[in-house]
Amino acid sequence: MTAHCPEDPSLERHFKGHRDAVTSVDFSLNTKQLASGSMDSCLMVWHMKPQTRAYRFAGHKDAVTCVNFSPSGHLLASGSRDKTVRIWVPNVKGESTVFRAHTATVRSVHFCSDGQSFVTASDDKTVKVWSTHRQKFLFSLSQHINWVRCAKFSPDGRLIVSASDDKTVKLWDKTSRECVHSYCEHGGFVTYVDFHPSGTCIAAAGMDNTVKVWDVRTHRLLQHYQLHSAAVNALSFHPSGNYLVTASSDSTLKILDLMEGRLLYTLHGHQGPATTVAFSRTGEYFASGGSDEQVMVWKSNFDIVDYGEVLRVQRPPATRASSSGTLPEVDPLVPPGRGRSQESMQSHSQEPVSVPQSLTSTLEHIVGQLDVLTQTVSILEQRLTLTEDKLKQCLENQQLIMQRTTP
């Protein structure tokens, strides 16, 4: 039986309509809609079906910092610098309900898996939980001592995780409203956090350019990635739990293979910081947004082949990796607080895999050529933009001359 290598991710579509940096993206349940928030104070709902007009929702008085579809896809929540949360019906009417949520910027909004409640995080240092349909404040979690950038429910709705500028990630029990554990290993502000689809792990991104993965049962640091050259602004787990995508101020997106504990792909698409990223509910697509005002939709491709099958063929039987939904302990990490380089992370405690030298050389050559191709395309895009600008200027000058010469 032959196993085919996963294909590279490909840029499927890109949407232009925002007038300032994109701050957040999220897919609806059926992947037919994609929502994005922006510093331009608007919320856009894009349709994946070609030639379908997007919805622009204007209601917030300041920058929209976060968006999240309800599990059913019938509602869409947004948070803003105007200190409010709005719950929208994502149709052409764009009707919304306003929650006077916080006393400072709302940084994050996330629905519980049952859709009955949602959690918000704010610069007022609090995390708040709300009833969706009764439109009522339920309770507040307030142990952070600086801005709270992000808060998420666990898949089963029992836990809440929050990330803060106080350099901690806190795990909360929703029922007791107590802080279960504080993770303090980040060396800078923690920008984003999310639960693994299994609910057994969390991943957090930081201004210290790192991504860290912890077990929420043992609170052990499982994986530590230092692959970006600037702050990591957002991350998203693939629904299978096998992959993680990150967005960074170094303008790249990176796909991490969590089963192997290594970098799979680096994607260059945005001109400037990549500010947000999210997988679709099926994992077939992921979307990214950036300070370049663009929303990009990528086809995953790499998840098409059954992951367990690939490993079974490529690896000796003794070193097969689990293809279950739980995140394996890929390799023992050094004690928390001590950094590790990318090279040591990839080489530490890994079984040797027999790969012919000729194949290795060929693959390295292909990777090098792809990097050259990526840079070439980027340069061509820049030149095309300059040409378009010059052509536009020529046309405008021609129109002015025509107007002056017309009696």
From Swiss-Prot:
Residues 342-357 have a biased composition (Polar residues). CDD domains: WD40 (cd00200). PROSITE patterns: WD_REPEATS_1, WD_REPEATS_2, WD_REPEATS_REGION. Keywords: Cell projection, Cilium biogenesis/degradation, Coiled coil, Cytoplasm, Cytoskeleton, Repeat, WD repeat. Residues 369-397 form a coiled coil. GO terms for cellular component: centriole; ciliary basal body; cytoplasm; spindle pole. WD repeats lie at residues 17-56, 59-98, 101-140, 143-182, 185-224, 227-266, 269-308. Disulfide bonds: none annotated. The keyword Repeat applies. Residues 317-357 are annotated as: Disordered. GO terms for biological process: cilium assembly. InterPro entries: G-protein_beta_WD-40_rep, WD40/YVTN_repeat-like_dom_sf, WD40_repeat_CS, WD40_repeat_dom_sf, WD40_rpt, WDR55_POC1. It comes from the Eukaryota. It is found in: Cytoplasm, Cytoskeleton, Microtubule organizing center, Centrosome, Centriole; Cytoplasm, Cytoskeleton, Cilium basal body; Cytoplasm, Cytoskeleton, Spindle pole. Interacts with POC1B. Belongs to the WD repeat POC1 family. Plays an important role in centriole assembly and/or stability and ciliogenesis. Involved in early steps of centriole duplication, as well as in the later steps of centriole length control. Acts in concert with POC1B to ensure centriole integrity and proper mitotic spindle formation. This is POC1 centriolar protein homolog A. It comes from Bos taurus. The gene is POC1A.
